[in-house]
């Protein structure tokens, strides 16, 4: 497997790999080095990396950190052989259907079909069984009935074959759908590479960028979009779970520029927020803060998001012109504020 190949190359480079060795605690010392405590003894190291998948917050708790990562149950099944595939003489194309929320690819002489159902479930929010290793969740095909109808309509051959096996397991989500790769906020010599939905496919590139940050202090590219420090203290467990559900439900939907989805809004407001709302303000969100973008000309003013300029462009332009030529007041709640005292 890929994991074994990576471990083999790591050993050749001098790494030590410990299997079946549960970590029980992490201790950071005054010189910022770490001791990893395991059931088989302690390991002293300079740097600790949290790359623990769905156990991210168990390890985070050992550092005193709560990461904005939640797990969702995700199901797919593999069919028995399909005659049309056996006789085709070529591989079937990968299919992703944003209307019915499923994806499909050939698996031997059958099909593997995965689903992003609206009736989705978080996983492990109340703790994870310590013995849940190389394990799966119970099947729950009733939850994906509505999605199955779309798949059957698109591929009638599915109704003529049986299901060979069903897989239901946890995958991780962050608040904005992007992973957390880089230094852990508030900790020294501590990094993470977590919140990846497809570690097998994403691990190589993200691991390369993380290695550069650890060795050189920064990566060769701007990595702010995956930096763990991009989230503030408002990203609690409840908000993380709600945003994970929203992201799962919108897996195959475009996220347009300037689109801010409704879940988890009003996490941070000021006394001016309801006053501006009463004046017809349209709000965006910046690090949890509700920030006014423009004043709607009418109560029924509605913007349809896309990749071009929308109706809000002229509204913002008018506000900019007014500020340039007149005196204006603006609420800047999303900016940093520093209190400096002393001589």
Region roles according to the model:
Residues 1-47, 204:
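Helical element adjacent to the flavin cofactor pocket in flavoenzyme catalytic cores
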Residues 5, 99, 108, 122, ...:
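C-terminal catalytic lobe of FAD-dependent flavoproteins
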Residues 17-19, 50, 113, 162-164, ...:
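General beta-strand structural signal in soluble alpha/beta enzymes
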Residues 25-138, 146-154, 236-269:
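Flavin-dependent oxidoreductases
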Residues 41, 54, 84, 109, ...:
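Short, glycine-/Ser/Thr-/acidic-enriched flexible segments
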Residues 66-69, 96, 217-222, 282-283:
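A short alpha-helix-loop-beta-strand transition element characteristic
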Residues 221-222, 227-343:
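Glycine/proline-enriched, intrinsically flexible loops and inter-domain linkers
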């Amino acid at each position: 497997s890929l994991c074994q190949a990576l471990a083999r190359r790591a050993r050749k480079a001098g790494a030590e790999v410990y299997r079946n060795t549960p970590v029980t605690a992490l201790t950071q010392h005054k010189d910022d080095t770490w001791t990893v405590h395991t059931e088989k003894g302690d390991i002293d190291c300079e740097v600790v990396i949290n790359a623990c998948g769905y156990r991210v917050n168990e390890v985070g708790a050992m550092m005193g950190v709560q990461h904005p990562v939640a797990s969702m149950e995700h199901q797919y099944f593999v069919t028995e052989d399909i005659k049309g595939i056996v006789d085709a003489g070529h591989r079937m194309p990968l299919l992703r259907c944003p209307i019915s929320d499923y994806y499909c690819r050939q698996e031997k002489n059958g099909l593997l079909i995965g689903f992003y159902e609206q009736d989705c479930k978080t996983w492990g929010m109340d703790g994870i069984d310590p013995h849940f290793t190389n394990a799966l969740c119970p099947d729950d095909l009733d939850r994906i009935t509505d999605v199955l109808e779309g798949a059957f309509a698109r591929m009638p051959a599915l109704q003529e074959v049986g299901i060979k096996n069903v897989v239901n397991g946890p995958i991780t989500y962050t608040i904005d759908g992007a992973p957390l790769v880089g230094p852990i906020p508030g900790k020294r010599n501590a990094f993470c590479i977590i919140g990846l939905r497809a570690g097998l496919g994403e691990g190589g590139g993200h691991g390369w960028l993380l290695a550069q940050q650890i060795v050189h202090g920064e990566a060769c590219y701007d990595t702010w979009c995956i930096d763990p420090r991009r989230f503030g203290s408002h990203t609690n467990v409840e908000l993380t779970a709600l945003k994970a559900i929203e992201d799962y439900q919108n897996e195959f939907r475009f996220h347009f520029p300037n689109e801010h989805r409704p879940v988890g809004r009003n996490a941070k407001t000021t006394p001016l927020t309801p006053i501006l709302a009463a004046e017809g303000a349209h709000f965006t969100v910046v690090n949890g803060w509700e920030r006014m973008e423009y004043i709607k000309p009418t109560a029924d003013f509605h913007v349809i998001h896309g990749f071009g300029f929308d109706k809000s462009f002229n509204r913002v332009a008018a506000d900019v012109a007014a500020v340039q030529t007149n005196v204006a007041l603006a609420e800047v709640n999303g900016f940093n504020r520093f209190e400096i005292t002393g001589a």
